[in-house]
């Protein structure tokens, strides 16, 4: 990796453990659906989330629409997110050798979340899909990131939780 200058990180399931937040959001969705007489289990909903993810679709919204067309917003409980144990030491080691950035499919407020975790300053820039209006794997988000980095594709590595990202 001697010619690599930049490392682009995803956020969820890469630096931040979102397991509890996702579980709670699915539980809330299932509870809502059951309350409006839609019979669905946690396992069924989770299965649809996984299918949507594999098919490059918005996992939660796609799964919810499989069971209901109600215009209901089930909030994502970000307060249950935590950094993985190795996140801080790994970033501390890498930022001395590489320029780091976050490119993630995230809602507005990603900067604030990273500041709350104490890792915002480890990154040269943070690019959320909400900033660009498209989500990974749309090439526009990657092109925007390359322009911000002033970097050729061959001088970076992406560290993501799924290969389609």
Predicted regions and their residues:
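Conserved Lys-Pro-Asp/Glu-containing loop-to-beta segment of HAD-superfamily phosphomonoesterases
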Residues: 2, 6, 135-165
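N-terminal helical cap/lid subdomain that shapes the substrate entry/recognition surface
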Residues: 2-89, 111-112
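Short beta-strand segments
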Residues: 10, 102-105, 160-161
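Conserved H-loop
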Residues: 39, 120-124, 152
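A short, structured active-site edge motif that brings together acidic residues
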Residues: 45, 122-133
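Anionic, Ser/Thr-rich low-complexity intrinsically disordered regions
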Residues: 54-55, 103, 134
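Substrate-recognition element of Asp-dependent hydrolases with the DxDx(T/V) motif
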Residues: 69-80, 87-117, 126-129
């Amino acid at each position: 990796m001697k010619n690599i200058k930049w490392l682009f990180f995803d956020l969820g399931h890469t630096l931040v453990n979102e397991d509890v937040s996702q579980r709670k959001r699915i539980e809330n969705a299932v509870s809502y659906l059951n309350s409006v007489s839609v019979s669905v289990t946690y396992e069924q909903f989770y299965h649809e989330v996984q299918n949507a993810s594999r098919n490059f679709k918005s996992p939660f919204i796609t799964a919810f629409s499989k069971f209901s067309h109600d215009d209901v917003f089930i909030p994502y409980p970000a307060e249950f997110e935590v950094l993985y144990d190795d996140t801080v030491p790994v970033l501390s080691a890498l930022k001395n050798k590489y320029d780091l950035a976050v490119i993630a499919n995230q809602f507005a407020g990603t900067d604030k979340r990273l500041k709350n975790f104490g890792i915002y300053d480890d990154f040269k820039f943070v690019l959320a899909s909400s900033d660009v209006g498209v989500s990974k794997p749309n090439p526009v988000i990657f092109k925007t990131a390359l322009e911000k980095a002033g970097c050729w594709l061959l001088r970076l590595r992406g560290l993501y939780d799924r290969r389609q990202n």
